[in-house]
Amino acid sequence: MGKFEAGLDGVTFTSNGCRLLGGFYKAAGAAPRPTAVLLHGLPGIEKHLDIAYRLRDLGWNCLYFHFRGCWGSEGRFSLAGLADDTRAAVEWVLKQQSVDKGRIALIGASTGSHPALICGGADPRIRAIVGVSPLIEPRAFQFPGEMAEEFAGMLNGITGQDLREQWQALPSPADSLGAFAPRPILLVAADKDAIFPPSYYADSVAKLANVQLIRNEESDHGFSACRSWLAQTVTDWLAAVFSEESSKSQ
């Protein structure tokens, strides 16, 4: 197989009949590369593409995409559809020649951490999961009506009331703890996060024996003041996890 060149391709793929839009950051290398799928939050203003750039610089491919009903992707937005869209993204990644199919990770931010945990925990092809300011226990957060209306205004086919009702109906990843058995999980939390503060994670971290929690004392929910730190923390952890897996397989 020839050498892979670094680049960025526009991407479309289908999930439940909806055409989803995204981009594929391609890393250079002589062999298929480890690959991450990056899942944005709600409504997805922060795309966390600095993590994608750093991953590519370190020899990783990275797919980012927009869930149905937001940022140009077709369909009506629904929280229940996040997991289906994530599965479709994973299937797209696994068809790419430049992807090492034994080294796939999911990185979810805020609400995007929910499908990362749900899908990553159930799919043995996913070898590691990262949650940044992650949604772990939906029913432990009371979605403010004003916030729901603001977010719904940026999405297609959903109202603020719909968002709040769908939020309460989301399953908890902690209810399927056994499925996560061999998959290392990193949760990155911010002490100044007004949405999911570190106390929000306490019970879940205690239940998940294979989870590592890293806290930043200075940042908010979006890590606005600590982007370089966040990108390095996530990529260093992924590099260590996959390096350890490679050592065990030799």
Language-model regions, residue ranges each:
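N-terminal cap/lid segment of alpha/beta-hydrolase-fold proteins
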Residues: M1-A30
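Catalytic nucleophile-loop/oxyanion-hole region of alpha/beta-hydrolase
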Residues: P43, C70-K101
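Conserved alpha/beta-hydrolase
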Residues: A52-E74
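Hydrolase active-site cap/lid region
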Residues: I118-L163, R183
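Conserved alpha/beta-hydrolase "acid-adjacent" motif
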Residues: A194-Y200
